[in-house]
């Protein structure tokens, strides 16, 4: 196919940290001798005790991943204390509220004071090194304070996205046996309140029935809305932090001590607790933040993600703050009060680096260019995308209309499991191709394998694996190392299997083609089909459900549900709406089904396996190439599904 290439821009060449020659040299060193390469770059963070061992990893057998394993450090020290002398009065966090008239700036000195106070509150209430703290918060500075306060005392945080339901929150509290929750009275999104404290109360009740008792709930006052109160359990954040000292010594943490758990969807029902550890993660998050975004002192950097996702962990909080950057936290949504909001914020705060998701770009593109044109955006120097592959049309619009053809676009590919960006352009080094994540970051060795596991060289399509470790890699699934091995290392022995399909072109550029397992990517957020299916089946009228993705013009993938009802029940629009509501309450708004097709039967093999390939084709309105249906127990169900499909071109 004919692909336009955009050479490195002159402006990027002139002020970049890395040119192509340096990229090629460093990359070669990083894969030929990772010990020496990372031994050097590990020094970018401060260590209380320097490491002598750099890399100790194996993808075979009882998979074990250790980096800098005898070093001692602390994440909050690296994100705050070490900057105070030179950058104490510099703005660490710019907070932009949901309401365009609400904003505030927090300096590194203020960040130190607040994080130390919150760390002392945690200690006062018995939280110790290794304890798990659940953070269920909107995008307010206190969410970042909570994360950093946990790292200061060595507690392990588990941030749960504020859009998740009480049931989803409870499941995550129970899985890591968390006994302390930090939340807020209400969140605000697009002008509407989100009942976080109420959801927390419900979740804590559900957890108690599963023998996990949350001892304390710390509540930040965001709206002043009325909330239920359990006097023995609930604490007001403002009262507690005012009553303690603004100094708290950082805990000396081993590089391999757990840092955080973040739950992500898998192809089987229960979300996995992805465990990241301290040293390697921070080295990798800070290094990728610096070089991928060409971050230089004085830049104003804005990643539009939520701290409930890994992008918020690595590229709103830890990466930028470790680099003494000014990071912008945005509470709102791209289209409130209208579709010009992002660009107004860019002008208001003179943002230089802007990192968002293709789904937001597609939706703003659909709103028209006028919303973009009424802002100047002259401060912008670099644009980035994250969360899913970006289609070339959206890339071109982002580059030409938003960036005025003067900002490189870094299309970054990575995962919750990888801790940081793995495949990406570097602004001063990489010629760009719309839709391609281009080349691997330092130390990352991609490999494409076919369905049988044979390595394919040169220009090829297949499944994307990574053949050696990098410091930001997850270490295990919390409490279930066997699941970690089975999920990521059993499909192709000795290789980390990403679950993504991939194409490599004749220039060695990588193009991510999307998930090859039963995981959906909806608006850049991963969602297991099994999770949605089990939510549907938990409704009393549903006997069976199968969920697949289909192309969606804004979200990338939409959620298409085939639902078989209990004997004697008949599907109608009222039931359709009830099922949509049911899924939202079980998982959260993110899992809202786009299409529900009532199906008397599902295409199954004689052994009872649902043929999802066929369901995908029908959902895509493409049933000319269904392939061999002779293995189905009842081939006639296919005709019925086609006749009643919901997604007609």
Swiss-Prot record:
The keyword Magnesium is assigned to this record: yes
Record-linked Gene3D superfamilies: 3.30.300.30, N-terminal domain of ligase-like
Source domain of life: Bacteria
One of the protein's GO biological processes: acetyl-CoA biosynthetic process from acetate
Cellular component annotations (GO), alphabetically ordered: cytosol
Ligand binding (CoA): 189-192, 311, 335, 523, 584
EC number(s) from the headed UniProt entry: 6.2.1.1
Cofactor: Mg(2+)
Keywords carried by this UniProt record: Acetylation, ATP-binding, Ligase, Magnesium, Metal-binding, Nucleotide-binding
A Pfam family assignment: AMP-binding
Sites bearing N6-acetyllysine, chain numbering: 609
PTM text: Acetylated. Deacetylation by the SIR2-homolog deacetylase activates the enzyme.
SUPFAM superfamilies tied to this protein: Acetyl-CoA synthetase-like (SSF56801)
Residues that coordinate or bind Mg(2+): 537, 539, 542
GO MF terms held by the record: acetate-CoA ligase activity; AMP binding; ATP binding; metal ion binding
Residues engaged in binding ATP: 387-389, 411-416, 500, 515, 526
Catalytic activities: acetate + ATP + CoA = acetyl-CoA + AMP + diphosphate
Listed HAMAP family: Ac_CoA_synth
Function of the molecule: Catalyzes the conversion of acetate into acetyl-CoA (AcCoA), an essential intermediate at the junction of anabolic and catabolic pathways. AcsA undergoes a two-step reaction. In the first half reaction, AcsA combines acetate with ATP to form acetyl-adenylate (AcAMP) intermediate. In the second half reaction, it can then transfer the acetyl group from AcAMP to the sulfhydryl group of CoA, forming the product AcCoA.
Similarity-based family: Belongs to the ATP-dependent AMP-binding enzyme family.
Protein name: Acetyl-coenzyme A synthetase
Biological source species: Sinorhizobium medicae (strain WSM419)
Lineage of source species: Bacteria, Pseudomonadati, Pseudomonadota, Alphaproteobacteria, Hyphomicrobiales
């Amino acid at each position: 196919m004919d692909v336009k290439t955009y050479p490195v821009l002159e402006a990027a060449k002139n002020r970049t940290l890395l040119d192509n020659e340096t990229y090629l040299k460093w990359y070669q060193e990083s894969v030929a001798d990772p010990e020496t390469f990372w031994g050097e770059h590990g020094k970018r963070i401060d260590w209380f005790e320097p490491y002598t061992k750099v890399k100790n990893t194996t993808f075979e057998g009882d998979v074990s991943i250790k980096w800098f394993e005898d070093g001692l450090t602390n994440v909050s020290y690296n994100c705050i204390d070490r900057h105070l002398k030179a950058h104490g009065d510099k703005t660490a966090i710019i907070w932009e509220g949901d309401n365009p008239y609400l904003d505030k700036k927090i300096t590194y000195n203020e960040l130190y004071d607040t994080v130390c106070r919150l760390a002392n509150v945690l200690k006062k209430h018995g939280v110790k090194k290794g304890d798990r703290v659940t953070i269920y918060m909107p995008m307010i500075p206190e969410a970042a304070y909570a994360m950093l306060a946990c790292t200061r005392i060595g507690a392990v945080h588990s941030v749960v996205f504020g859009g998740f339901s009480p049931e989803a929150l409870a499941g995550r509290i129970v899985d890591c046996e968390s006994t302390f929750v930090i939340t807020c009275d209400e969140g605000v999104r697009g002008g509407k309140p989100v009942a976080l404290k109420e959801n927390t109360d419900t979740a804590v009740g559900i957890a108690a029935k599963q023998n996990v008792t949350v001892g304390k709930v710390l509540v930040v006052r965001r709206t002043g809305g009325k909330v239920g109160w359990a006097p023995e359990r609930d604490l007001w954040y403002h009262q507690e932090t005012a009553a303690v000292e603004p100094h708290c010594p950082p805990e000396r943490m081993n590089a391999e001590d757990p840092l955080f758990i973040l739950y992500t969807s898998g192809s089987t029902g229960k979300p996995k607790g992805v465990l990241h550890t301290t040293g390697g993660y921070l080295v990798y998050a800070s290094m990728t933040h610096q070089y991928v975004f060409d971050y230089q002192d004085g830049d104003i950097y804005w990643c539009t993600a939520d701290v409930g996702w890994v992008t918020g962990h690595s590229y709103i909080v830890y990466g930028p703050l470790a680099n003494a950057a000014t990071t912008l936290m945005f509470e709102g949504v791209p289209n409130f009060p209208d579709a010009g909001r992002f660009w107004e914020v860019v002008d208001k705060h003179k943002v230089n680096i802007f990192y968002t998701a293709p789904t937001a770009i597609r939706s703003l593109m659909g709103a028209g260019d006028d919303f973009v044109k009424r802002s100047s955006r002259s401060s912008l120097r670099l644009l980035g995308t994250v969360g899913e592959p970006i289609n070339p049309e959206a890339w071109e619009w982002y580059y030409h209309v938003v960036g005025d053809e003067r900002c490189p676009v870094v299309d970054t590919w990575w995962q919750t499991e990888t801790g940081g960006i793995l495949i990406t352009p570097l602004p001063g080094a990489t010629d760009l191709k719309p839709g391609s994540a281009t080349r691997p970051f330092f130390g990352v060795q991609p490999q494409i394998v076919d369905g049988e596991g044979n390595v394919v060289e040169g220009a090829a399509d297949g499944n994307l694996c990574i053949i050696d470790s990098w410091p930001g890699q997850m270490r295990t699934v919390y409490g279930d190392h066997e699941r970690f091995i089975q999920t990521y290392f059993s499909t192709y022995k000795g290789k980390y299997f990403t679950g993504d399909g991939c194409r490599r072109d004749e220039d060695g550029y990588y193009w991510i083609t999307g998930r090859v397992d039963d995981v959906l990517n909806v608006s850049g957020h991963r969602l297991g089909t099994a999770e949605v299916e089990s939510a549907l089946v938990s409704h009393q009228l549903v006997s069976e459900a199968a969920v697949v993705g289909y192309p969606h013009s804004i979200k990338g993938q939409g959620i298409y549900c085939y639902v078989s009802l209990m004997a004697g029940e008949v599907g109608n629009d009222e039931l359709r709406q009830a099922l949509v509501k049911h899924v939202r309450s079980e998982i959260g708004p993110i899992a809202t089904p786009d299409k529900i097709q009532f199906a008397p039967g599902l295409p199954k093999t004689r052994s009872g396996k649902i043929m999802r390939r066929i369901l995908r084709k029908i959902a895509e309105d493409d049933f000319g190439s269904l392939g061999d249906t002779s293995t189905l127990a009842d081939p006639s169900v296919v005709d019925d599904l086609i006749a009643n499909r919901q997604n007609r071109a």
